[in-house]
């Protein structure tokens, strides 16, 4: 089998042929060679090497996947890849993620088996891949799927309520009955006992069958055994690697209930572990903070009045088989049946600052508190010297309230539940935070917007269709591991190993539009900007910790605006609370990672991508697949928008990792613009222009900024991934008709034909401009489109917009017939000026871009204000915090993007003293 084979990529087989049908595609010769798009040879950049994100190789490597970019034209669709660590060939499986317009590979994904640890500077290159010593094998039958990694064999069901029928090592069954569970109850105020529901399989798809990596996708809904109700759709992916004993689980559920009548009391993954041997040889483990580990036996032999012997105690503490009872001191051995054995165990993380471990002997008996701590590592284990299961939930304490529960450890089979939301915390309360009785009319809602910045509307603050994705790990082990090894597994759960390439190589491939370049401190002016970029990231990293921006529905997001009087972010004030990707926070973080390669930046951006792509977007229901504007509740605003769900925010993570769930989210946005026919943004401010919602509409009004920019990002990504000519044609039609408008981008928007992507031409030459049009990813997607598709009128229209938005009023009047009004965020738009300067080779325009960037609009926007915070202590605040009252997330994200892109585009023109 070719190393590039992948079932869901079969339809891309015709891509090379399609490339010949792109007469308007830009050729390499038509692209000016700049620092942003030079080849590796021209720039002296390093080749396609890989490195471990955290620097050092991991102690445990259970299988890893990463993405690699390639220069245009370097590798064909038929290219296979090898991975070489010096003279050593490492087994690797490869597949395509995206293609350049000429059909050559733009991004590929690569996977290596468990136990293989490529050294830094290992080289990915064209060649015949080495096969794994024991290739992973997937066997499919009518009712099951079997995945054999060479170490474990997992049998998966195609129907029913059990997903993982069994996992075996050799002849021994280690795990059985893997299933999804949910608890449903009435409103959070209801005292009734919740109903247990099981996840029922609808479809199972083998997305990847090896030989290094297998991916199995399971979809279905949670079902009630009493009334037959099916709710909470789920998508679960199971990942296996050759030579591995682990299963990685990506668990997604979508909320489709009525939060006013019912609520989720718990949701998680449950499985059974057969136990063999004496109760004193059964071991329980939970990870704490750092390398801390709680470890006990179901029945202890330590601390007793009669000592069984030093060898017995040492073996139990180490998790090894104890000597035969007949060899113990008989005063202890003959009385062991009188020592209480503990059947049920629990690690419960109730908040970001506290966890509790407890145990009990049986149902109906009291729980004993065994330990307490602050932030658990999220790993548990139950087993014996003859086999057991380690299991963990990533971001365990950050995503509280979670629980790892073990039941029946005194029986032949222990039950394990990894609660992603623990029932001990009470039910999820997803109801609106206000009744809105005083805001029933549009006029009242607009008045509310004036005071709280909240765009409230009854019925629009519901969580219908919001989703949550969690990452879990399961290890089927031959015996209870040492404490040191369990601490290593806990580290995998906490920070899974990640492989990346270097910023220099990424940059040399000219991906992501050439709008960024590796961090450069070669002179004092550049260093000053780099210092400010680093400070901004560190400040938000610190605020997440100090302000406790954690929790199941919150982790990954940041707050929007600060309240200096309360010394608190405005968590309870309408549109000033959660940020929800406003003004491209995600893009700022990802570009900061691309240019620095720093692990802490990657993981901050990764958490935000998971959150904003799942929680801040409606994946089903009346608002799907639109995102929701910033609000006290992530889904609370009535402004449902493409600019929040935009594929631009997800592209970076997808291409860097090949993550299939994020791939789903990208595909989900392909037809998102159709939602504008039923959720009309201007219904409150221009009710006379609103038409009746029509799900079968053939056209919609779309702005050229946040609307079309988001649609274009989705079409571009789908075209790159699949080669679908319909996506290319939509892009070309929309670009061509934007370029043909009387005022180009300054026309503002138009009627978009949904089938073709073409805009109707405006009947007048009125100038329309919004300061928000270009700050939700439009700059980034247009840079790629100009690079990829040769549409001269579009290119000209975009360069006009970039040049004139911040131009002097006299120049605007000369070119447009009037001076622009409402063109705020001038500092943020300095990067548009820089793009025009670079593209046109205009030195004067480059100098103007730096003036716009440095001066800003207010004194606190430029570098003139030192990036400082002050410590605020009690009794002014609940606990000490660092405060920078002048900081806003909008300003930080846009300043960061302007800094990064101006440095990349016109860095050679930077003034010596940017202060």
Language model: regions and residue ranges:
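Catalytic cores of eukaryotic secretory-pathway lumenal/extracellular enzymes that build
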Residues: 540-580, 612-727, 739-771, 775
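Terminal, non-catalytic domain-edge segments
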Residues: 481-492, 717-744, 748-915
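An acidic-aromatic substrate-binding cleft motif
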Residues: 132-157, 483-591, 595, 603, ...
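C-terminal segment of N-terminal export signals and the immediately downstream linker at the start
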Residues: 23-49
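Surface-exposed beta-strand/loop patches in extracellular or lumenal glycoproteins
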Residues: 54-77, 264-272
């Amino acid at each position: 089998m070719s190393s590039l084979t992948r079932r869901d990529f079969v339809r891309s087989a015709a891509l090379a042929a399609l490339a010949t049908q792109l007469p308007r595609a830009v050729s390499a010769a038509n692209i000016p060679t700049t620092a942003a798009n030079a080849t590796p040879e021209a720039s002296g950049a390093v080749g396609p090497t890989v490195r471990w994100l955290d620097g050092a190789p991991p102690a445990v490597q259970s299988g890893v996947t990463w993405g690699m970019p390639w220069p245009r034209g370097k590798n064909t669709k038929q290219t296979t890849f090898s991975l070489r660590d010096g003279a050593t060939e490492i087994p690797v499986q490869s597949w395509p993620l995206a293609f350049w317009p000429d059909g050559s590979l733009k991004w590929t994904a690569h996977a290596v088996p468990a136990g293989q640890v490529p050294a830094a500077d290992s080289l990915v290159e064209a060649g015949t891949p080495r096969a794994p010593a024991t290739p992973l094998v997937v066997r499919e039958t009518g009712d099951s799927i079997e995945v054999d990694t060479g170490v474990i064999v997992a049998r998966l069901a195609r129907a029913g309520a059990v997903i993982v029928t069994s996992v075996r090592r050799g002849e021994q069954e280690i795990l059985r009955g893997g299933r999804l569970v949910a608890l449903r109850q009435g409103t959070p105020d209801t005292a009734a006992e919740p109903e247990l529901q099981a996840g029922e399989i609808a479809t199972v798809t083998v997305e990847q069958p090896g030989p290094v990596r297998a991916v199995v996708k399971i979809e279905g809904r949670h079902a009630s055994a009493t009334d037959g109700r099916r709710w909470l759709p789920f998508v679960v992916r199971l990942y296996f690697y050759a030579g591995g004993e682990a299963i990685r689980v990506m668990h997604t559920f979508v909320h489709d209930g009525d939060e006013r009548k019912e609520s989720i009391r718990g949701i998680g993954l449950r499985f059974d572990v057969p136990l063999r041997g004496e109760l004193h040889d059964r071991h329980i483990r939970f990870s704490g903070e750092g390398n801390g580990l709680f470890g006990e036996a179901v029945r202890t032999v330590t601390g007793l009045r009669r000592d069984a012997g030093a060898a017995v105690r040492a073996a139990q503490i180490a998790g090894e088989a104890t000597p035969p009872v007949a060899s113990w001191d008989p005063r202890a051995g003959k009385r062991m049946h009188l020592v209480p054995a503990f059947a049920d165990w629990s690690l419960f993380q109730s908040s970001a600052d506290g966890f509790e471990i407890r145990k009990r002997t049986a149902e109906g008996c009291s729980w004993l508190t065994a330990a307490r701590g602050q932030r658990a590592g999220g790993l548990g284990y139950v087993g014996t010297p003859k086999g057991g299961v380690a299991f963990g939930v990533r971001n365990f304490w950050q995503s509280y309230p979670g629980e790892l529960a073990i039941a029946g450890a005194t029986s032949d089979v222990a039950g394990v539940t990894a609660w992603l939301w623990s029932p001990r915390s009470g039910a999820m309360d997803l109801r609106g935070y206000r009744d809105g009785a005083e805001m029933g009319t549009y006029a009242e809602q607009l008045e509310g917007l004036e005071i709280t910045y909240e765009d409230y509307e009854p019925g629009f603050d519901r969580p219908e269709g919001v989703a949550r994705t969690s990452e879990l790990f399961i290890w089927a082990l031959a015996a209870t591991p040492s404490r040191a090894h369990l601490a290593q597994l806990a580290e995998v759960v906490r920070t899974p190993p990640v492989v990346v390439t270097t910023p220099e190589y990424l940059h040399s491939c000219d991906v992501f539009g050439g709008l960024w370049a590796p961090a450069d401190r070669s002179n004092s002016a550049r260093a000053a900007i780099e210092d400010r970029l680093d400070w901004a990231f560190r400040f938000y990293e610190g605020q997440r910790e100090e302000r406790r921006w954690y929790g199941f529905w919150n982790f990954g997001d940041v707050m929007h605006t600060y309240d200096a009087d309360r010394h608190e972010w405005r968590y309870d004030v309408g549109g000033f609370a959660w940020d929800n990707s406003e003004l491209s926070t995600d893009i700022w973080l990802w570009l900061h990672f691309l240019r620095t390669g720093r692990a802490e930046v990657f993981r901050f951006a990764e958490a935000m991508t998971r959150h904003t792509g799942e929680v801040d977007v409606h994946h089903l229901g009346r608002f799907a697949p639109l995102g929701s504007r910033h609000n006290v509740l992530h889904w609370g605003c009535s402004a449902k928008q493409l600019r929040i769900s935009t594929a631009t925010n997800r592209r970076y993570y997808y291409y860097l990792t090949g993550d299939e769930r994020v791939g789903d989210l990208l595909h989900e946005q392909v037809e998102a613009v159709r939602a504008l026919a039923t959720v009309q943004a201007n219904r409150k401010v221009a009710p006379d222009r609103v038409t009746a919602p029509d799900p079968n509409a053939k056209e919609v009004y779309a702005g050229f900024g946040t609307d079309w920019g988001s649609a274009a990002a989705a079409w571009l990504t789908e075209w790159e991934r699949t080669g679908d000519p319909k996506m290319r044609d939509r892009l070309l039609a929309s670009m061509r008709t934007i370029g043909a408008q009387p005022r180009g981008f300054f026309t503002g928007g138009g009627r978009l034909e949904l089938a073709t992507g073409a805009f109707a031409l405006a009947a007048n030459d009125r100038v329309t401009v919004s300061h928000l049009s270009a700050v939700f990813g439009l700059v980034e997607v247009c840079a790629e489109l100009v690079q990829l598709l040769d549409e001269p009128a579009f290119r000209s229209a975009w360069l006009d917009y970039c040049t004139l938005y911040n131009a002097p009023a006299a120049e605007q009047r000369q070119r447009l017939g009037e001076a622009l009004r409402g063109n705020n965020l001038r500092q943020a738009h300095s990067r548009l000026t820089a793009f025009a300067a670079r593209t046109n080779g205009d030195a004067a325009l480059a100098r103007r871009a730096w003036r716009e960037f440095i001066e800003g609009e207010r004194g606190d926007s430029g570098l003139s204000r030192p990036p400082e915070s002050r410590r605020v202590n009690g009794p002014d605040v609940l606990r000490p915090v660092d405060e920078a009252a002048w900081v806003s997330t909008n300003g930080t994200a846009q300043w960061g993007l302007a800094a990064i892109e101006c440095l990349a585009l016109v860095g050679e023109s930077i003034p010596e003293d940017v202060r």
